[in-house]
Protein backbone atom coordinates (compact mmCIF):
# COMPACT_ATOMS: atom_id res chain seq x y z
CA UNK A 1 0.00 0.00 0.00
CA UNK A 2 1.26 3.51 -0.84
CA UNK A 3 2.71 5.41 2.09
CA UNK A 4 1.32 8.71 0.81
CA UNK A 5 -1.53 9.86 3.04
CA UNK A 6 -3.66 11.18 0.18
CA UNK A 7 -5.00 7.88 -1.14
CA UNK A 8 -8.34 6.24 -0.33
CA UNK A 9 -6.65 3.15 1.12
CA UNK A 10 -4.12 4.96 3.32
CA UNK A 11 -6.68 7.50 4.56
CA UNK A 12 -9.13 4.73 5.47
CA UNK A 13 -6.34 2.82 7.24
CA UNK A 14 -5.38 5.87 9.34
CA UNK A 15 -8.97 6.68 10.25
CA UNK A 16 -9.66 3.08 11.30
CA UNK A 17 -6.45 2.86 13.32
CA UNK A 18 -7.50 5.83 15.44
CA UNK A 19 -11.26 5.26 15.35
CA UNK A 20 -11.67 8.75 13.95
CA UNK A 21 -15.18 9.99 13.16
CA UNK A 22 -15.70 13.10 11.04
CA UNK A 23 -17.22 16.14 12.73
CA UNK A 24 -19.71 17.78 10.42
CA UNK A 25 -19.56 20.94 12.54
CA UNK A 26 -15.88 21.35 11.60
CA UNK A 27 -16.48 20.79 7.89
CA UNK A 28 -13.94 17.97 7.74
CA UNK A 29 -13.30 16.57 4.25
CA UNK A 30 -9.91 14.95 3.64
CA UNK A 31 -8.19 14.92 0.24
CA UNK A 32 -7.50 11.48 -1.23
CA UNK A 33 -5.77 12.47 -4.50
CA UNK A 34 -2.04 13.26 -4.37
CA UNK A 35 -2.15 14.88 -7.84
CA UNK A 36 -4.32 17.65 -6.40
CA UNK A 37 -1.79 18.20 -3.60
CA UNK A 38 1.01 18.63 -6.12
CA UNK A 39 -1.05 21.15 -8.06
CA UNK A 40 -1.74 23.09 -4.85
CA UNK A 41 1.95 23.36 -3.91
CA UNK A 42 2.82 24.28 -7.52
CA UNK A 43 0.14 26.99 -7.52
CA UNK A 44 1.43 28.32 -4.18
CA UNK A 45 4.98 28.39 -5.58
CA UNK A 46 6.44 26.61 -2.56
CA UNK A 47 10.23 26.14 -2.49
CA UNK A 48 12.88 25.19 0.06
CA UNK A 49 13.35 28.94 0.61
CA UNK A 50 9.72 29.31 1.72
CA UNK A 51 8.07 29.11 5.13
CA UNK A 52 4.45 27.97 5.14
CA UNK A 53 1.54 28.37 7.52
CA UNK A 54 -1.11 25.73 6.96
CA UNK A 55 -4.59 25.98 8.43
CA UNK A 56 -6.52 22.79 9.13
CA UNK A 57 -4.05 19.99 8.31
CA UNK A 58 -6.57 17.21 9.00
CA UNK A 59 -4.63 13.94 9.00
CA UNK A 60 -1.67 15.57 7.26
CA UNK A 61 -2.12 14.89 3.53
CA UNK A 62 -1.39 18.45 2.35
CA UNK A 63 1.03 18.98 5.25
CA UNK A 64 3.11 16.05 3.99
CA UNK A 65 3.33 17.55 0.51
CA UNK A 66 4.23 20.96 1.96
CA UNK A 67 6.92 19.41 4.18
CA UNK A 68 8.55 17.85 1.11
CA UNK A 69 8.70 21.16 -0.76
CA UNK A 70 8.99 23.94 1.86
CA UNK A 71 11.65 25.04 4.34
CA UNK A 72 9.37 24.81 7.38
CA UNK A 73 5.65 24.29 7.95
CA UNK A 74 3.60 25.45 10.93
CA UNK A 75 0.09 23.98 10.89
CA UNK A 76 -2.87 25.19 12.97
CA UNK A 77 -5.29 22.41 13.94
CA UNK A 78 -8.40 23.12 16.01
CA UNK A 79 -9.50 19.49 16.53
CA UNK A 80 -7.57 17.97 19.43
CA UNK A 81 -8.51 14.45 18.27
CA UNK A 82 -6.26 14.91 15.24
CA UNK A 83 -3.08 15.76 17.18
CA UNK A 84 -1.96 12.15 17.87
CA UNK A 85 -2.77 11.23 14.27
CA UNK A 86 -0.60 14.09 12.98
CA UNK A 87 2.21 13.08 15.36
CA UNK A 88 2.09 9.67 13.67
CA UNK A 89 1.57 10.59 10.01
CA UNK A 90 4.14 13.41 10.02
CA UNK A 91 6.75 11.76 12.25
CA UNK A 92 9.25 11.56 9.37
CA UNK A 93 9.27 15.34 8.87
CA UNK A 94 11.35 17.39 11.30
CA UNK A 95 10.41 20.63 9.53
CA UNK A 96 6.74 20.50 10.61
CA UNK A 97 5.24 21.89 13.80
CA UNK A 98 1.56 21.47 14.64
CA UNK A 99 -0.04 24.17 16.78
CA UNK A 100 -3.25 23.19 18.54
CA UNK A 101 -5.60 26.13 18.37
CA UNK A 102 -8.11 28.23 16.48
CA UNK A 103 -6.35 30.41 13.93
CA UNK A 104 -9.16 32.97 14.31
CA UNK A 105 -8.04 33.54 17.92
CA UNK A 106 -4.30 33.20 17.36
CA UNK A 107 -1.67 35.91 17.12
CA UNK A 108 -0.33 34.61 13.81
CA UNK A 109 2.40 37.24 13.62
CA UNK A 110 3.73 36.06 17.01
CA UNK A 111 3.60 32.44 15.86
CA UNK A 112 5.66 33.32 12.78
CA UNK A 113 8.29 35.05 14.94
CA UNK A 114 8.47 32.25 17.51
CA UNK A 115 7.94 29.01 15.56
CA UNK A 116 10.06 29.44 12.43
CA UNK A 117 13.83 28.99 12.74
CA UNK A 118 14.27 31.45 9.86
CA UNK A 119 11.32 33.88 10.16
CA UNK A 120 12.98 36.17 7.63
CA UNK A 121 12.24 33.75 4.76
CA UNK A 122 9.25 34.50 2.48
CA UNK A 123 6.00 33.35 4.08
CA UNK A 124 3.10 31.72 2.28
CA UNK A 125 -0.24 30.57 3.66
CA UNK A 126 -1.85 27.40 2.33
CA UNK A 127 -5.11 25.86 3.52
CA UNK A 128 -8.01 23.57 2.73
CA UNK A 129 -10.69 25.74 4.33
CA UNK A 130 -14.08 24.48 5.51
CA UNK A 131 -16.92 26.59 4.15
CA UNK A 132 -18.22 27.80 7.50
CA UNK A 133 -15.01 29.70 8.39
CA UNK A 134 -13.64 30.58 4.95
CA UNK A 135 -14.50 34.28 4.95
CA UNK A 136 -13.61 35.04 8.61
CA UNK A 137 -10.20 33.37 8.24
CA UNK A 138 -9.25 35.12 5.01
CA UNK A 139 -10.37 38.53 6.30
CA UNK A 140 -8.49 38.02 9.59
CA UNK A 141 -5.29 37.18 7.71
CA UNK A 142 -5.68 40.31 5.56
CA UNK A 143 -6.60 42.72 8.35
CA UNK A 144 -3.96 41.42 10.78
CA UNK A 145 -1.31 42.33 8.20
CA UNK A 146 0.27 38.87 8.30
CA UNK A 147 3.52 39.26 6.31
CA UNK A 148 2.58 36.63 3.70
CA UNK A 149 3.55 37.07 0.04
CA UNK A 150 0.64 34.94 -1.05
CA UNK A 151 -2.24 32.81 0.18
CA UNK A 152 -3.46 29.69 -1.60
CA UNK A 153 -6.78 28.26 -0.48
CA UNK A 154 -8.89 25.31 -1.45
CA UNK A 155 -12.49 26.23 -0.74
CA UNK A 156 -16.03 25.84 -1.99
CA UNK A 157 -16.16 26.76 -5.69
CA UNK A 158 -18.98 29.24 -5.14
CA UNK A 159 -16.78 31.20 -2.70
CA UNK A 160 -13.79 31.04 -5.05
CA UNK A 161 -16.02 32.48 -7.79
CA UNK A 162 -17.01 35.35 -5.50
CA UNK A 163 -13.42 36.12 -4.51
CA UNK A 164 -12.15 36.16 -8.12
CA UNK A 165 -15.20 37.86 -9.68
CA UNK A 166 -15.26 40.95 -11.89
CA UNK A 167 -17.84 43.78 -11.85
CA UNK A 168 -21.27 43.30 -13.42
CA UNK A 169 -21.39 39.57 -12.67
CA UNK A 170 -23.62 37.79 -10.17
CA UNK A 171 -20.63 36.60 -8.12
CA UNK A 172 -19.20 40.12 -7.66
CA UNK A 173 -19.86 41.62 -4.24
CA UNK A 174 -18.46 43.02 -1.02
CA UNK A 175 -16.32 39.90 -0.43
CA UNK A 176 -14.71 40.36 -3.86
CA UNK A 177 -13.81 43.93 -2.96
CA UNK A 178 -12.65 43.13 0.59
CA UNK A 179 -10.06 40.73 -0.83
CA UNK A 180 -9.12 42.22 -4.20
CA UNK A 181 -8.50 45.60 -2.55
CA UNK A 182 -5.33 44.04 -1.07
CA UNK A 183 -4.70 40.96 -3.22
CA UNK A 184 -4.61 39.87 -6.85
CA UNK A 185 -7.00 36.92 -7.08
CA UNK A 186 -6.71 34.02 -9.52
CA UNK A 187 -8.96 30.96 -9.62
CA UNK A 188 -6.28 28.37 -10.36
CA UNK A 189 -8.29 25.18 -10.90
CA UNK A 190 -11.47 23.30 -10.02
CA UNK A 191 -11.34 20.37 -7.58
CA UNK A 192 -14.12 17.78 -8.07
CA UNK A 193 -15.99 16.62 -4.98
CA UNK A 194 -15.01 13.01 -5.78
CA UNK A 195 -11.43 13.50 -4.48
CA UNK A 196 -12.54 14.00 -0.86
CA UNK A 197 -13.42 11.67 1.99
CA UNK A 198 -16.22 12.02 2.93
CA UNK A 199 -17.48 13.42 -0.37
CA UNK A 200 -18.97 16.92 0.02
CA UNK A 201 -22.10 18.05 -1.79
CA UNK A 202 -20.35 20.59 -4.02
CA UNK A 203 -17.13 21.01 -5.99
CA UNK A 204 -14.21 23.00 -4.63
CA UNK A 205 -11.64 25.26 -6.26
CA UNK A 206 -8.12 26.42 -5.52
CA UNK A 207 -7.65 30.16 -5.44
CA UNK A 208 -4.30 31.95 -5.37
CA UNK A 209 -4.10 35.39 -3.74
CA UNK A 210 -0.97 37.47 -4.28
CA UNK A 211 -0.43 40.57 -2.16
CA UNK A 212 -0.41 43.86 -4.04
CA UNK A 213 2.46 46.28 -3.36
CA UNK A 214 -0.18 48.91 -2.62
CA UNK A 215 -3.96 48.62 -2.18
CA UNK A 216 -5.82 48.77 -5.50
CA UNK A 217 -7.18 52.26 -4.81
CA UNK A 218 -6.44 55.18 -2.51
CA UNK A 219 -9.04 55.67 0.20
CA UNK A 220 -9.23 58.20 3.01
CA UNK A 221 -10.62 55.71 5.53
CA UNK A 222 -10.41 51.96 4.88
CA UNK A 223 -13.00 51.07 7.52
CA UNK A 224 -15.51 53.49 6.01
CA UNK A 225 -14.67 52.28 2.49
CA UNK A 226 -15.62 48.71 3.41
CA UNK A 227 -18.72 49.95 5.23
CA UNK A 228 -19.84 51.69 2.02
CA UNK A 229 -19.16 48.63 -0.14
CA UNK A 230 -21.09 46.34 2.20
CA UNK A 231 -24.01 48.79 2.26
CA UNK A 232 -24.00 49.01 -1.55
CA UNK A 233 -24.63 45.26 -1.81
CA UNK A 234 -27.10 45.03 1.10
CA UNK A 235 -29.91 44.42 -1.41
CA UNK A 236 -28.36 43.60 -4.76
CA UNK A 237 -31.34 44.57 -6.91
CA UNK A 238 -31.63 48.02 -5.37
CA UNK A 239 -29.82 51.11 -6.61
CA UNK A 240 -26.86 52.70 -4.90
CA UNK A 241 -29.15 55.46 -3.69
CA UNK A 242 -31.63 53.09 -2.05
CA UNK A 243 -28.94 51.07 -0.32
CA UNK A 244 -26.86 54.05 0.81
CA UNK A 245 -29.86 56.08 2.00
CA UNK A 246 -30.92 53.10 4.09
CA UNK A 247 -27.46 52.81 5.66
CA UNK A 248 -26.87 56.57 6.02
CA UNK A 249 -30.25 58.30 6.66
CA UNK A 250 -28.53 61.70 6.87
CA UNK A 251 -28.17 61.58 3.07
CA UNK A 252 -31.92 61.71 2.42
CA UNK A 253 -32.56 65.47 2.96
CA UNK A 254 -29.52 66.30 0.79
CA UNK A 255 -30.17 63.96 -2.13
CA UNK A 256 -30.04 66.63 -4.86
CA UNK A 257 -26.75 67.97 -3.55
CA UNK A 258 -25.32 64.44 -3.31
CA UNK A 259 -26.45 63.49 -6.82
CA UNK A 260 -24.83 66.62 -8.26
CA UNK A 261 -21.55 66.00 -6.46
CA UNK A 262 -21.32 62.34 -7.44
CA UNK A 263 -22.28 63.04 -11.06
CA UNK A 264 -19.31 65.41 -11.19
CA UNK A 265 -16.97 62.47 -10.45
CA UNK A 266 -18.75 60.07 -12.79
CA UNK A 267 -20.90 58.10 -10.35
CA UNK A 268 -24.65 57.86 -10.92
CA UNK A 269 -26.71 56.82 -7.91
CA UNK A 270 -29.22 54.96 -10.08
CA UNK A 271 -26.53 52.34 -10.76
CA UNK A 272 -26.37 49.11 -8.78
CA UNK A 273 -23.39 48.31 -6.61
CA UNK A 274 -22.34 45.37 -8.78
CA UNK A 275 -21.51 47.76 -11.67
CA UNK A 276 -18.84 49.72 -9.78
CA UNK A 277 -15.22 48.62 -9.82
CA UNK A 278 -12.94 49.12 -6.83
CA UNK A 279 -11.49 52.51 -7.90
CA UNK A 280 -15.07 53.77 -8.36
CA UNK A 281 -16.01 52.54 -4.89
CA UNK A 282 -12.96 54.39 -3.56
CA UNK A 283 -14.16 57.62 -5.19
CA UNK A 284 -17.65 57.03 -3.83
CA UNK A 285 -16.51 56.38 -0.25
CA UNK A 286 -14.05 59.28 -0.23
CA UNK A 287 -16.77 61.65 -1.45
CA UNK A 288 -19.38 60.26 0.97
CA UNK A 289 -17.01 60.48 3.91
CA UNK A 290 -16.40 64.19 3.28
CA UNK A 291 -20.06 64.82 2.43
CA UNK A 292 -21.32 63.33 5.70
CA UNK A 293 -18.89 65.45 7.71
CA UNK A 294 -20.30 68.66 6.24
CA UNK A 295 -22.91 70.51 8.27
From Swiss-Prot:
Pfam families: RrnaAD. SUPFAM superfamilies: S-adenosyl-L-methionine-dependent methyltransferases. GO terms for cellular component: cytosol. The lineage of its organism: Bacteria, Bacillati, Bacillota, Bacilli, Bacillales. The gene is rsmA. Its EC number is 2.1.1.182. It is found in: Cytoplasm. Belongs to the class I-like SAM-binding methyltransferase superfamily. rRNA adenine N(6)-methyltransferase family. RsmA subfamily. The keyword Zinc does not apply. This is Ribosomal RNA small subunit methyltransferase A. Keywords: Cytoplasm, Methyltransferase, RNA-binding, rRNA processing, S-adenosyl-L-methionine, Transferase.
Amino acid sequence: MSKDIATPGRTTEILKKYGFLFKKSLGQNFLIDSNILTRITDTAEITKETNVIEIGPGIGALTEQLAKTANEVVAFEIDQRLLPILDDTLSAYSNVQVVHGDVLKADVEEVVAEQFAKPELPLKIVANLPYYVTTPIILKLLHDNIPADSMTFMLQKEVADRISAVPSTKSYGSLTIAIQFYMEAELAFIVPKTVFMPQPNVDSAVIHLKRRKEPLAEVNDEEFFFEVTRASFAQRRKTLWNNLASKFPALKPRKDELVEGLNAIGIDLIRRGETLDIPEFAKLSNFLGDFLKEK
